[in-house]
């Protein structure tokens, strides 16, 4: 079972290399934004799902400036697709960027960069969740989360927060327990959940 730990370490190391190679942070900083790593890479809980998640903050949302940062990122040869969604006039008050990156080994990585207006409803939420997870995570719970992510069939779609809530709040330690926990909590919103 040591293999899943090595896989997690290698994927997390590679994810951070990709951030540097593509100059994600620098591209957003060039427009005066603050880019914050969130999600499984920020908590050390990345396993098989190769996702790089960032929240990007500015005082105001400018489509033109957001496109300027995105164009710089898209110019990296590893970026093979980039999509944009304008959610400025919604409760989220954001501009979403979703990119696909092919690494040197041919593996596809998903990059989600959510450009958020400072002071909006979701300002800092993902960062608070990551901070709380980091504060309560033990070696045993970290190992349980990584093992569950590893054991999850690739055909099954489970968001990270489900694993974290199941293990950290629900005491789940095996895949059968995760399946039962998910069934018992089907329809529950994890928006606002903190350990």
Residue ranges of predicted features:
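Short, charge-rich amphipathic segments
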Residues: 1-11, 65, 137-145, 149
């Amino acid at each position: 079972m040591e293999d899943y730990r090595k896989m997690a370490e290698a994927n997390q190391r590679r994810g951070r290399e990709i951030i540097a190679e593509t100059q994600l942070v620098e591209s957003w900083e060039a427009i005066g934004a603050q880019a914050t790593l969130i999600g499984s890479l920020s908590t050390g809980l990345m396993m098989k799902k190769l996702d790089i998640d960032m929240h990007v903050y500015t005082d105001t949302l400018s489509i033109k400036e957001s496109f300027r940062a995105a164009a710089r990122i898209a110019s990296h040869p590893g970026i093979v697709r980039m999509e944009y969604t304008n959610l400025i006039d919604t409760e989220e008050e954001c501009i979403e960027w979703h990119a696909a990156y092919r690494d040197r080994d041919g593996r596809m990585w998903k990059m989600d960069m959510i450009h958020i207006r400072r002071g909006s409803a979701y300002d800092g939420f993902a960062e608070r969740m990551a901070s709380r997870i980091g504060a309560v995570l033990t070696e045993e719970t970290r190992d349980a989360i990584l093992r569950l992510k590893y054991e999850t069939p690739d055909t099954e779609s489970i968001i990270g927060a489900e694993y974290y809530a199941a293990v950290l709040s629900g005491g789940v330690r095996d895949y059968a327990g995760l399946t039962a926990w998910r069934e018992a909590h089907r329809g529950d919103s994890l928006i606002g959940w903190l350990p």
